[in-house]
A protein has these predicted regions:
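Short linear motifs in exposed loops
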Residues: 19-21
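A general alpha-helix detector
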Residues: 24, 52-60
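Charged interaction scaffolds used for protein-protein
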Residues: 1-11, 15, 30-45, 51, ...
Length: 110
């Protein structure tokens, strides 16, 4: 699923794709109570709730092709118990890819 709006990064036990599809954006807005623009602005500024990080990662995994059950298990094992210094940059990278596009794809086109 390597395209303009997917982010690929090691998470858990291997490299995984993260993508916020339109359906996942709607769900992210619902579970966080913020519109996607407000959530992005807040996360980029470092103003976030832990749950927003976890939901962004979980929904990014689902949008990237992981089943909802597996995404929940991965987040429970590799996001909830980990330091914010590990999970926050991943959540921001997922949202930055949604906002700006994939930096790898941009570099490939240049």
């Amino acid at each position: 699923m390597a395209d303009l709006l997917s982010h690929r990064q090691f998470f858990g036990d291997r490299e995984r794709d993260f993508a916020l599809t339109p359906e996942m954006i709607t769900e992210l807005e619902r579970v966080t109570g913020r519109g996607i623009g407000g959530l992005c602005r807040a996360m980029f500024a470092g103003d976030f709730h832990h749950a927003e990080i976890v939901h962004t990662v979980r929904l990014g995994l689902i949008g990237g092709g992981v089943s909802p059950e597996e995404a929940g298990a991965l987040v429970a094992a590799f996001a909830h118990p980990r330091p914010l210094s590990e999970t926050y940059p991943l959540a921001v990278a997922i949202l930055e890819t949604l906002w700006f596009g994939s930096s790898e794809t941009k570099r490939d086109r240049e």
